[in-house]
Regions:
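Bacterial N-terminal signal peptides
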Residues: 2-13
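Extracellular/periplasmic carbohydrate-active domains that bind, remodel
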Residues: 18-573
Length: 573
């Protein structure tokens, strides 16, 4: 791989990371804890433990944190709780070495990690105590640019887990997925992989495990057709902070940093506007964007009385510590223009009490150049959406994409099934994702519990690599959950009848109906045509009420609990 391309002012020649002195630290607010190797390990550990005491059980709490490690070696134990992002700030993961456990533990009794959401580990290496790293997680848990110097398990003592995401990661030993229901690994490497359950998808991974779908349920895509890795913070050997923007890559395989830094370019952090919760408003943020500034959200919740508008090409918007945008007056939280190269990363969009037409709208207004978009697409990375759970929230659509060639690299779009403000008539949401643009590519699409189509895809040449969806638990009766006469419910994944070209790999759709007599006719609904192709689909009933009658259109038998039937369709058509 070529070395990382950065602006000349970002690097000082002739210095190695072994010569790093503690750099001047930017003011990123009280909830970004910055550690350097000169600090006593006990002092670092004390701060980590204080954060975990706050965040361990704070599923719907208001606090947000980023734990930031500057290049060097550390001997600490890092438990990762809710809304906590652990970051290494080296040019490669190996520039930050943690000798000790970095772990995510199950948040429910009986080792159950199915509600272990909203936490992240990015950009460092870990040598786990005892040789094995435990990462028991479910949705909205980025694991990026990591090097595990040992083994890794994706569960806690074989308790249930519903993940998950891994990208640009090297695990020297074995990855044991165990009781994970599903997983996507993109551009990652390991010594070996063991385990499978319902839907395991591997894209651009050089050493995929042996076996073929459906037993084990492995979906293997040899190369990643097009992707841009997520922007990330970096501190160079002179102590300068920058945001690195990896280059667009095509037909890639394996991690980006084998031969040095991830290829890309850097922008000095000093040129970013640093937003602060409780201080900044939509108005103050928009004023800075209008001046041509890029934007860094520090951890916290931002109450917005208007939409944040990203209109300039190549704008970077990066959130730390699950920075959360919540519209308060029924507006869209963020709207981008149809301009090439916009990058949105690391944000949680949380619906407010007044229904929003969308939470994030991509490509609004006059159409831009499709030729330029093809060469420099808009990309979304680790963008998460929530309707309800922390309180009443309402949105018609969560993520609305108009721009052609948009890349989505990991998203969870969740209408809450538990927490505060939850009910069929309380946290209302028609659709999780609506795609109108052509040539949109999505890796790691998790969409759950919305009240009509979870996904409605109207653009042509769409591609989805991994889809996980639970349809809504809580329709009170079939009449409240019917798309058309003679059709029960709304398909989870709907490709519009006008579409002529669409393809999906590795789709799992599950039901947990709480009321008797509620069913879904088909999990996936698509038009017929030579350009419509799907690979490796499964439906599962997780509760004893209702059923999914077909997997895709009229193919696939009904789900059943007794006897257990998990219908699968290998190829469509």
């Amino acid at each position: 791989m070529a070395g990382l391309l950065v602006c000349a002012a970002c690097l000082a020649p002739g210095l190695s990371y072994g010569q790093v002195t503690p750099p001047a630290k930017p003011d990123l607010g009280p909830n970004v804890l910055i550690f350097d190797p000169s600090m006593p390990a006990a002092q670092i550990q004390e701060q980590i433990d204080k954060v975990y005491a706050i965040q361990q059980h704070s599923e719907f709490g208001a606090a947000r944190y980023a734990l930031v490690f500057l290049p060097g070696k550390y001997q600490v134990d890092v438990p990762v709780g809710f809304y906590t992002q652990v970051l290494g700030l080296g040019a490669t993961p190996d520039a930050v070495e943690i000798d000790g456990n970095v772990h995510s533990d199950a948040s429910l009794p009986h080792n159950n990690a199915t509600c272990t959401f909203w936490r992240a580990a990015e950009g460092f290496s870990v040598k786990p105590t005892g040789g094995t790293m435990q990462w028991a997680v479910s949705q909205a848990v980025p694991f990026r640019r990591m090097h595990v110097r040992g083994n890794m398990v994706l569960h806690q003592s074989r308790g249930w887990a519903s993940g998950g995401w891994m990208s640009d990661t090297l695990v020297d030993g074995n990855v044991g997925s165990g009781t994970q229901q599903q997983w996507i690994a993109r551009n990652s490497e390991w010594g070996s992989w063991t385990g499978a359950n319902w839907n395991m998808v591997f894209v651009g991974d050089p050493s995929t495990p042996q076996g073929e779908w459906p037993s084990p349920p492995y979906t293997k895509v040899d190369h990643t057709p097009i992707v841009r890795e997520k922007p990330f913070l970096q501190v160079d050997a002179s102590g300068r902070w920058s945001v690195q923007m990896p280059l667009l890559s095509k037909d890639s395989k394996g991690v980006t940093w084998h031969d040095g830094s991830t290829p890309g370019e850097g922008i000095l952090l000093s040129t970013f506007y640093i937003a602060r919760p409780g201080v900044d408003t939509a108005g103050s943020i928009n004023a800075q964007l209008a001046k041509g500034r890029n934007l860094l959200f520090t951890p916290g919740i931002y109450e917005l009385d208007d939409a944040i508008r990203v209109t300039r090409r190549n704008t970077v918007v990066l959130g730390l510590g699950f920075a959360t945008l919540r519209p308060t007056h029924g507006t869209t939280a963020m709207i981008t223009a149809d301009r090439e190269g916009i990058k949105i990363a690391g944000l949680l969009f949380d619906a407010g009490p007044v229904s929003s037409p969308a939470l994030l709208e991509v490509g609004a207004g006059p159409a831009g150049s499709k030729a330029r978009m093809a060469q420099n697409p808009i990309s979304l990375h680790d963008v998460f959406f929530r309707v309800g759970g922390a309180g009443v929230g309402r949105a018609r659509v969560n993520l609305l994409i108009h721009s052609a060639y948009t890349i989505v690299d990991h998203t969870w779009i969740w209408r809450a099934d538990h927490g505060a403000g939850v009910g069929w008539d309380s946290n209302t949401s028609d659709n999780g994702l609506v795609v109108n643009g052509d040539h949109v590519t999505i890796y790691g699409l998790f969409v759950e519990h919305h009240q009509q189509f979870q996904v409605l895809w109207s653009g042509n040449y769409g591609r989805t690599y991994f889809y996980q969806s639970e349809i809504p638990y809580d329709p009170p009766d079939q009449a409240s959950y019917s798309n058309a006469k003679g059709v029960n419910g709304w398909a989870s994944y709907k490709v519009a009848d006008t579409v002529t070209n669409h393809e999906g790999w590795g789709l799992g759709i599950y039901s947990v109906f709480l009321s008797p007599g509620v069913n879904l006719t088909r999990a996936i609904e698509v038009p017929r045509g030579p350009g419509i192709r799907f690979h490796h689909m499964i439906t599962v009933a997780l509760g004893d009420k209702g059923a999914i009658s077909h997997v895709i259109d009229d193919q696939g038998e009904p789900t059943s609990i007794q006897p257990r039937v998990t219908p699968k369709v290998a190829e469509f058509p």
